[in-house]
């Protein structure tokens, strides 16, 4: 295989008047972080090359990728169904651009584009739920939703193997007063013990529908029965199951539970749907 050269830069950036000095203490401090040290050790072991530093020059319909003039098969794409190359998708984009432009130009708190309302209704019909709400990404959904549904006096249980964005949202919820408990494995008995032990106003358990690193699925049926039986709500980040797992691709949660009426399920629009965004299932009252 031909060796690739990345776009990774080196050395100090010039700055008039020495303005870069204000960034040097920050750079030095961050360089000592354990995650940074791990990344740097990887780079040292691989001649300073990391995939994130490669500039993708072209992507063919058959997933051949071009980096630095070399061609490879791309097995790292998260466009699960290849819909980003589907002619009907391209046609819909071309038809919408003259009327709607490339950006809605406003917050959802100010107005909601008709196309967004239509998309949320179609997602709800596809999933068999009352309603859905679209977010810019799954990460933003998790960091926005978890602090909103688990506040002061509430218990938030998080599976340790859940996606990092779930943990980010959980930390924000904890900063807002929620009691945060991590469980090392999604064992319904352990979860039940935690709920019974903690005196909380309400309970939410956050977990992945499909673990992004292993592809495994947790015991959602047992967890839903346990959490709901003790007065709580199951919150499932099903980003990696949306569109590809279960009947009609409704995801791991729907495949396991049969219905999404009693849980909150976050799905991705950036993977199987090949666009950008996320959604959460909800009722009209929750959406309001």
Regions found by a protein language model. Give the residues of each.
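Active-site phosphate-binding strand-loop segment of PLP-dependent enzymes
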Residues: 181-236
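Active-site PLP attachment segment
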Residues: 248, 254-288
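Conserved N-terminal alpha-helix of the aminotransferase class I/II PLP-enzyme fold
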Residues: 91-137
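Conserved PLP-anchoring active-site segment centered on the Schiff-base-forming lysine
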Residues: 146-164
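Substrate-binding/gating loop at the entrance of the active-site cleft, primarily
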Residues: 137, 158-174
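N-terminal "arm"/small-domain region of PLP-dependent enzymes with the aminotransferase-like
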Residues: 3-22, 36-100, 232
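Short, small-residue-enriched loops and turns at beta-alpha junctions
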Residues: 82-83, 109-113, 164, 188-189, ...
């Amino acid at each position: 295989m031909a060796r690739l050269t990345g776009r990774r830069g080196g050395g100090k950036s010039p700055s008039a008047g020495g303005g870069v000095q204000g960034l040097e203490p920050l750079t030095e401090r961050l360089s000592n972080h354990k995650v940074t040290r791990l990344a740097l050790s990887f780079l040292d072991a691989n001649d300073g090359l990391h995939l994130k530093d490669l500039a993708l020059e072209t992507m063919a319909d058959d997933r051949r990728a071009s980096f630095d003039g070399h061609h490879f098969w791309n097995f790292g794409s998260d466009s699960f169904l290849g819909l980003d190359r589907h002619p009907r998708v391209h046609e819909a984009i071309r038809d919408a651009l003259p009327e709607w432009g490339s950006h809605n130009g406003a917050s959802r708190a100010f107005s909601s584009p008709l196309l967004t309302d239509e998309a949320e209704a179609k997602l709800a019909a596809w999933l068999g739920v009352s309603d859905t709400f679209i977010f810019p990404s799954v990460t933003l959904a998790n960091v926005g939703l978890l602090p909103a549904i688990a506040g002061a006096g509430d218990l938030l249980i998080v599976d340790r193997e859940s996606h990092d964005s779930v943990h980010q949202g959980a930390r924000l919820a904890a900063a807002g007063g929620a009691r945060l408990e991590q469980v090392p494995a999604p064992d319904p008995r352990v979860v039940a013990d935690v709920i019974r032990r903690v005196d909380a106003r309400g309970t939410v358990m956050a977990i992945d529908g499909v673990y992004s690193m292993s592809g495994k699925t947790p015991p959602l049926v047992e967890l839903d029965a346990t959490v709901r039986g003790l007065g709580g709500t199951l919150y499932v980040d099903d980003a990696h199951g949306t569109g590809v797992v279960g009947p009609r691709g409704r995801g791991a949660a729907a495949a396991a539970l049969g219905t999404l009426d009693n849980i909150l399920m976050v799905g991705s629009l950036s993977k199987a749907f090949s666009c950008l965004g996320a959604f959460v299932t909800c009722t009209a009252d929750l959406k309001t």
